[in-house]
Amino acid sequence: MKITHLTTAILLALTLSACSSDDENTSTQPPVNPEEPTVPDPEPETPEQPVPVPEVYLDENFDQMTEIPATWSMPRSNAGTVYLSEGSLFLDGRANDTQMTSVMLPQEYQKLRNYRIDMEFAYVERNNGGRWGSIIYRAADHYAEPAFSPYYQFAIRGDATGASGLELALRQPTNAWNVLHKSAYKENIDPTKTYKATVIVHGKRVRHYINDELVLDTSLPYSLDQGGIGLSTAGLLMRVEQLKITEQLDALPESNKVTDIIDHRLPVSMAPTLAQPAPLTGNASVNATHIAYQLDEQLNLLNANNQKVMHLRDYLNDSNRRTLPLLTVKNENTITQLKALSTNYDLTDFTFVSDQADLLRKVRLALPSSRTALDYSRHTGLTHSRKDIVQIAHNTNSSLSKIVILPSHLVKQEVVSHLQRLLITPWASTNTTTPVSAAQILTTGVNGILTTQPDTFQNLMKSMAPNTLLRKPLITGHRGIPALDDENTLESMLKAIEVGADAVEYDVYITKDGHVVLMHDDTTTRTTGVARKIEEMTLAEVRELRTLGKQRQIPTMDEVLTEVTKYPHVVNFIEIKSPKPEIVPAIKALLDQHDAYDQSIVISFSGAQILHMKNVLPGVSTGFLTNTPTAQSDIVNTRRILDATQQYSSTFNPSFGGLSKELMTLASQRGVTFWPWTFRLNKEDFNRMYVQGTHGLTTDYAHDSSNLIVKLKTPAEITATVGKPVEISGQTTTQVGEKTTYIFKEMLVLPQSAKYTQAGQAVTFSEKGTAYVMPRYNYTMAPNYSYTLYAAPVKVTIQ
C-alpha cells in the first residue's frame, strides 16, 4: 500500500467583500481618543508561507477492500482470525482470553515516528468484561524476536469503567506486559455503539483519546526508535469500520497548565480582558490580566520608552507571576530567538503582537502552539465599511490570529459585532481616563481592552448588575431549525432567519461531479430513506431525493448562499463533513461567486480540513468542533483548549456538556471564544449559558430566543429637573427585531456626575449640573435566569 499525501497550495488573496451594518449608532459623543495616522492603511494580505498540512498515510473504511492486503501481517501466534466482511475489518480474538489476535500494517510504517492513529470500532461480542481491543504503536518489525516486540499499546477493556478499563502498556521481548498507566473511562463499551480511539505520539510524548476526549497525556519511558502500527484483541470480536493514520507535525506540549491569573469575579458575564502597557514607573495595576511589552532581538522586555524591564527568561522564571504578556515582535530575528528559547520554555500562554500580518504568520509557523494578535490600533484610515471590515477579518485570519486590536474610531458596536459574527476577537486600544469614555467602549461589546487605565474600566464593571451582558450571545440555527422544518433544507434555513437567528449552520459534502450539497450524514438514509452515499451520487441524482418529513429537496450550497446573502446580518456557519480536500476549493469558488466573505465562516471536526483552509481560504475564520476537556482542574482544561484552538487558529466549538462558567472565563481571557452545540429540549442549559455570556449558542430551537431583549436605544442627551426621578424614553429590540418604546427608570450613574440620591433603582439629582448615566434593562428568561443590558452613556443636564 502506498503512502498517500495531502497536497498544499497557496492561492491568491480572497476577493474582499463586505456589508452594510445592521446596528444603529445614535451616539453624539466625540470619538474615543482619536489618533493621527502613523502607518499606512493595510492591504489585503496574501500569505507567502503555507501552513504545513499533515500527510495522510492511510485512510481506509474497508468498503472497497475485498481481501486483506498481502503487505499486512498476521503474527504466527494469533489465537483467532482476522478477516473482512460487509465493509468492515474484523479481529476475532474470542478463541483465547489472553493470547492476542493481531494484524500489523505494512512494513513501510516502520520509518515513521510521529503520527496520529484514529480507529472507529465496535465490540461485537466479548467473552467477559475484562477482555480488550487495542491500538499498537511504535512496534518493532517482523524480524524482531519475538516478532513486532517491543511495542506500546492503547488497550480498552469492555468494562472500561473499571480501574484498569484503559491501559497504556509496553509489550516486552520477554512476552510480558509492563502496564505503565491505568485509568477508568466514563462508560463501559456498549456493543450497540461505535467508538473512536485515537493515539497521538510525537517523540516521547503520547496522548490517548476516546471519542475525541483526552483520557491519557503522558511521556513514554522509552522512545523505541521504531514505528510499527497494528491492531489487536484478546477475548472479544472487534469490528473496525475506519482506520486513519496521519502525520503528526507538532510536538505535544510538556506542560499541562497555564498561568493562574487572578479571577476578579466581576458581575459582567465573560467580561472583556484588560491589558495594560508596561508602566514607565511603579507597578502595573492588579486589575490588568495582561501586561504589554516591546520585545527586542535579545528577548529583552521593554516599556514604551524602550527601557529594559527584564529579560524574557526572567519573566518566565517568575513563579509568582499572575499576569500574561503581550509581546510586540518587530522582525524575524526575534522569531529565531524565540524558536530557540522554546526548546526549553513553554510559550503557549503568551500573546505575540505585530501590525504586520505576514510577520505574525511566521511567528505561528515557527511556534505552532503560540497565540498572536494583529495590532491595527494605528490604522486610522480604515472605515466601518463592508469592504474594510472584511479586510480586517481577512488579514487577522491570514496572520493565523484570532485577536485584532482596532483603531479607536472603529470601536463601535456595529463594527465590533460584525467582526464577532465572523469569529474574530476584537480588542480596543485606548488612553482614556474618563468613566464616560470607558463606558462607551464597554457598551460596544469588545472582547478586550488595552488601556493605560485598567482601574477605570474595572471599577465601572464592578458597579454593574449580576449577569450583565455587554456583548450579545449569538444564536445559530443548527441545520436551520429542525424543530420546525426538515434539517439542512433551504426552507429550514429561511425559517431560522425568520425567527431571528444570527447564523445558520449547515453541513456540506461534495458530489462525485463536484457540487457542494447539504447533508449531515455521509449517507442519505436517515433523512430521505434512500440508502446511498452522498459523495457517490451526482447532483442530478441528489435532485431526485426528498426529505422524509416535508418532502423538501436537498439544496446545494450555491442555492443557500443565494438566499442567505439577502440578509446581510446573517452568517453562514459552513460545516465541512466531507473528508475530501477538494471540497475546500469548491467552497472558495462559491464564496467568490456570491461575494459572501462578510457572511461566511467554516467549522469542522477535521483538523486536516481546517489546516487545508488556512492555505486555500486563509482569510476565512474557522471553528474547531470538539468536546469539552474533562480534567478536574480548570487550569489544565484551559491548556487543553489552547492546545486545540491555537494549533488550528480557530474558535472553540464544543459539545456544551461539562462547559462551566469558570472554564469559559479563564480561557476567554486568552482570546478564546466559545460556540457550544447543540441545545435542544435542555432549556435550562441554554438559559444558563446565555446569561453566562457564551459567545454563540447553536440550537435546534432558534425560535425560543425570538423574544429575548438584545438591544437598547436611548437618546444621547436629555434634560432633568432637580428633585424629580429621572426617566428616559427609549426603545428595546428583540432578537427577532421587534422594537418597543420603553421608559427607562433604572440607570447607573457614572462617577464625576452631579449629586444624586437613589431609591431602589430610581435616580433623583439633588443639584443642578451635568451627569452621565447608563440606562439599564433587566430581562428574565426563566426562573433563576435573568440578565441585564446597559445602554451607552446618556448626558443629563440637570436644571
Regions found by a protein language model. Give the residues of each.
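Sec-dependent signal peptide recognition
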Residues: 2-9
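Bacterial Sec-dependent N-terminal signal peptides
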Residues: 9-58, 214-215
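Extracellular glycan-recognition regions
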Residues: 44-262, 353
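C-terminal active-site rim and adjoining tail of enzyme catalytic domains
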Residues: 252-332, 373-472, 476-479, 625-721
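Metal-dependent phosphodiesterase/phospholipase catalytic core, i.e.
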Residues: 256-388, 397-411, 420-422, 513, ...
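Conserved, mostly hydrophobic/aromatic
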Residues: 356, 441, 453, 478, ...
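Extracytoplasmic soluble-region selector
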Residues: 710-799
